[in-house]
């Protein structure tokens, strides 16, 4: 007896057809469990390319649910991701100036979400702007009705604060499909008569040794890796070049042998995080998808090995 079910899919960067198939399988299962509203959650940086996968999956879910309209907003103000006049900001800069333009798999070169989404879908895309949101749920509902009458299928929604998300929430009551980052979720529980729970604060403290596994190449993660190293804590880099030559298993074993005696003294860091020029050089040799998969599989093996060493408190940053 639960109020919400999360199905975690690795569908962000796989071929669009596979992402659609996985998402539709998840939808069928959720419908069989009695789900009343489907929430297609994606990253607050709207990671995608003109091929997808946000647009194609959204379209497929809309078709399967028989709905002609949904919203799209990755806004997550608590994490500095806001949408204003349809443009996505990361902190105080446009997304395409934030470092996300250098993402190794989904470089984001345009912060205009209406344009980005329109490139990925055949349905018309429009905007519910900040002025409409500020007037509350009824005005938002009226704007939705007007857009539907115009033949719009997807509306990007402005949100610069949690207050905006809480105003948006009631307007989404009864909408078969919501697509968004995780931020929009804060405005939905009240639609189902749910109140904040103390359950999370009652969970037992985590146990086990501590480790960080980092594969993200974002500006923020590069800075975090540099900070961790500056504190003097043990850190070991995984070289994509070493993995390229069929040495993945040997590299993983080397990392675990290094980490084993250190874990008892505090957290260790294993990272493949690199500057954009390094990433591009590896991609040029291997191809974008192959380079990502190579590092991903190595880090997964490292994470499993760390868990076997009682590194049961893992912080995983991308990859």
Segments from the language model and where they lie:
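Short beta-strand segments
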Residues: 6-10, 41, 71-75, 156-160, ...
């Amino acid at each position: 007896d639960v109020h919400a079910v999360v199905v975690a899919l690795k569908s962000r960067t796989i071929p669009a057809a596979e992402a659609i198939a996985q998402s539709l399988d998840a939808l069928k299962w959720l419908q069989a469990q009695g789900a009343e509203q489907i929430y297609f959650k994606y990253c607050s940086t709207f990671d995608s390319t003109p091929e997808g996968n946000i647009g194609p999956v959204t379209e497929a879910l809309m078709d399967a649910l028989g709905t002609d309209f949904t919203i799209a907003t990755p806004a997550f103000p608590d994490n500095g991701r806001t949408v204003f006049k349809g443009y996505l900001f990361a902190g105080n800069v446009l997304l395409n100036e934030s470092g996300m333009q250098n993402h190794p798999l989904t470089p984001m070169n345009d912060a205009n979400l209406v344009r980005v989404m329109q490139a990925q879908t055949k349905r018309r895309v429009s905007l519910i702007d900040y002025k409409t949101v500020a007037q509350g749920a009824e005005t938002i509902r009226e704007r939705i009705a007007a857009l539907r009458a115009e033949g719009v299928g997807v509306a990007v929604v402005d949100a610069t604060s949690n207050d905006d998300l809480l105003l948006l929430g009631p307007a989404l009551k009864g909408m078969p499909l919501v697509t968004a980052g995780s931020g929009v979720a804060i405005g939905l529980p009240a639609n189902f008569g749910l109140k904040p729970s103390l359950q999370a604060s009652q969970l037992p403290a985590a146990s086990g040794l501590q480790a960080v596994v980092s594969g993200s190449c974002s500006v923020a993660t590069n800075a975090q890796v540099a900070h961790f190293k500056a504190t003097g804590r043990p850190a070991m880099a995984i070289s994509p070049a070493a993995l390229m030559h069929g040495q993945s298993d040997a590299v993983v074993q080397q990392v675990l042998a290094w980490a084993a005696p250190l874990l008892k003294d505090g957290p260790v860091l294993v990272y493949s995080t690199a500057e954009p020029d390094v990433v591009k050089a590896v991609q040029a040799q291997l191809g974008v998808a192959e380079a990502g998969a190579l590092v991903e599989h190595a880090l997964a093996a490292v994470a499993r090995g760390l868990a076997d060493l009682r590194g049961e408190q893992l912080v995983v940053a991308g990859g």
